[in-house]
């Protein structure tokens, strides 16, 4: 038996290679280079939200109770946006507003900017994670591309929209009821439901739900019965080489139902990707438009006729009056610092009243 003693021919690894080996090692929870962005940002944003909804009041920013400590529940608690007077300040803890005082920072709404910015980078980190893993296992990057839809909506609603307005104050607060209030605000001040980009977004999301239901049902309906298991989940070997369901039978079924059907699996699944992602992108584009105060559809001729003819009213003119009511009530309540007072005679009345 011969033993060779000598120097290894392998060169010592540099710091980058050492980090790369550790970060991309196969483990239960993959870390990766993207994890350096994802995990800290996700931890801080989620931790900030849990802290804010548990302990922090919105009395100084909105005149509201918004924490569990004040008696709110899961649906009514929120981390509210900074006060309108803070404009677009990043509200850094060490900045001129809070001056290192954590309590003051929370009172001014610093947790909102903390959560929004860390949340945005966490979402971007999650998309990069999908890119990184796809590259590692030699997949195409469509998962990451699809996730750009939710990212675009988050960034447009929580960051770009308030940047186009007078301050972070007009962004949504992080809470269930707070988001509902923001939706009413969007309708009243921007007539959002009549915006074509919102219509495309609704068509994309609901259309995707329909496609998902149809696709799942069709696959279940056309499974090959070649297994001996008791149910769908046990009848097939996960490493089987043959097709699990009959595309030919599915095509024949839907051809009879609609007169047209997908005959290509690749086109079918690309379409299921395309519909929701495009819908989300269109919604995000629409919100960017609202940041610039672009108008939705206006049917002024109907409004003029409704104002002149007491017997003429359409669903559109009724909605316009409803929007005026939302603005009249919401502006005074949401912006008490403006001291808005609307006399009774200027509040909107429909022709029916």
UniProtKB/Swiss-Prot annotation:
One of its GO terms (biological process) is photosynthetic electron transport in photosystem II. This is Photosystem II D2 protein. Its EC number is 1.10.3.9. The D1/D2 heterodimer binds P680, chlorophylls that are the primary electron donor of PSII, and subsequent electron acceptors. It shares a non-heme iron and each subunit binds pheophytin, quinone, additional chlorophylls, carotenoids and lipids. There is also a Cl(-1) ion associated with D1 and D2, which is required for oxygen evolution. The PSII complex binds additional chlorophylls, carotenoids and specific lipids. PSII is composed of 1 copy each of membrane proteins PsbA, PsbB, PsbC, PsbD, PsbE, PsbF, PsbH, PsbI, PsbJ, PsbK, PsbL, PsbM, PsbT, PsbX, PsbY, PsbZ, Psb30/Ycf12, at least 3 peripheral proteins of the oxygen-evolving complex and a large number of cofactors. It forms dimeric complexes. NCBIfam families: psbD (TIGR01152). One of its GO terms (cellular component) is chloroplast thylakoid membrane. Keywords: Acetylation, Chlorophyll, Chloroplast, Chromophore, Electron transport, Iron, Magnesium, Membrane, Metal-binding, Oxidoreductase, Phosphoprotein, Photosynthesis, Photosystem II, Plastid, Thylakoid, Transmembrane, Transmembrane helix, Transport. The chain crosses the membrane at residues 41-61, 125-141, 153-166, 208-228, 279-295. The keyword Acetylation applies. Its main location: plastid. The lineage of its organism: Eukaryota, Viridiplantae, Streptophyta, Charophyceae, Charales. It is a multi-pass membrane protein. 2 of the reaction center chlorophylls (ChlD1 and ChlD2) are entirely coordinated by water. The gene is psbD. The keyword Cytoplasm does not apply. The modification Phosphothreonine is found at residue 2. Fe cation binds at residues 215, 269. The modification N-acetylthreonine is found at residue 2. It catalyses: 2 a plastoquinone + 4 hnu + 2 H2O = 2 a plastoquinol + O2. It comes from Chara vulgaris. Photosystem II (PSII) is a light-driven water:plastoquinone oxidoreductase that uses light energy to abstract electrons from H(2)O, generating O(2) and a proton gradient subsequently used for ATP formation. It consists of a core antenna complex that captures photons, and an electron transfer chain that converts photonic excitation into a charge separation. The D1/D2 (PsbA/PsbD) reaction center heterodimer binds P680, the primary electron donor of PSII as well as several subsequent electron acceptors. D2 is needed for assembly of a stable PSII complex. It holds the Pfam family Photo_RC.
């Amino acid at each position: 038996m011969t033993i060779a003693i000598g120097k290894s021919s392998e060169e010592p690894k540099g710091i980058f290679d050492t980090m790369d080996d550790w970060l991309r090692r196969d483990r239960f929870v993959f870390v990766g280079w993207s994890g350096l962005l994802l995990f800290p940002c996700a931890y801080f944003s989620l931790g900030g939200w849990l802290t804010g909804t548990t302990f922090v009041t919105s009395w100084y920013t909105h005149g509201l109770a918004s924490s569990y400590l004040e008696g709110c529940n899961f649906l009514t608690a929120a981390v509210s946006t900074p006060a309108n007077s803070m404009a677009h300040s990043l509200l850094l803890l060490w900045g001129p507003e809070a001056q290192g005082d954590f309590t003051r920072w929370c009172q001014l709404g610093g947790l909102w900017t903390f959560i929004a910015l860390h949340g945005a980078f966490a979402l971007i980190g999650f998309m990069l994670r999908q890119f990184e893993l796809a590259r590692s296992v030699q997949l195409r990057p469509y998962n990451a591309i699809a996730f750009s839809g939710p990212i675009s909506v988050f960034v447009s609603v929580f960051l770009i929209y308030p940047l186009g307005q007078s301050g972070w104050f007009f962004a949504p607060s992080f809470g269930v009821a707070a988001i509902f209030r923001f939706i009413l605000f969007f309708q009243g001040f921007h007539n959002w439901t009549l915006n074509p980009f919102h219509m495309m977004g609704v068509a994309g999301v609901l259309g995707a739900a329909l496609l998902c239901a149809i696709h799942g049902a069709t696959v279940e309906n056309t499974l090959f019965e070649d297994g001996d298991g008791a149910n769908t989940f046990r009848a097939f070997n996960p490493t089987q080489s043959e097709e699990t369901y009959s595309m030919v039978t599915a095509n024949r079924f839907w051809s009879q139902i609609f007169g047209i059907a997908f005959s290509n699996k690749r086109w079918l699944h690309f379409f299921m990707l395309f519909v929701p992602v495009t819908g989300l992108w269109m919604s995000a584009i629409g919100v960017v438009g609202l940041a610039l105060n672009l108008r939705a559809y206006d049917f002024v001729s109907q409004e003029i006729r409704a104002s002149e003819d007491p017997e003429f009213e359409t669903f559109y003119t009724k909605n316009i009056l409803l929007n005026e009511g939302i603005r009249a009530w919401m502006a005074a309540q949401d912006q008490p610092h403006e001291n808005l007072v609307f006399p009774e005679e200027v509040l909107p009345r429909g022709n029916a009243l």
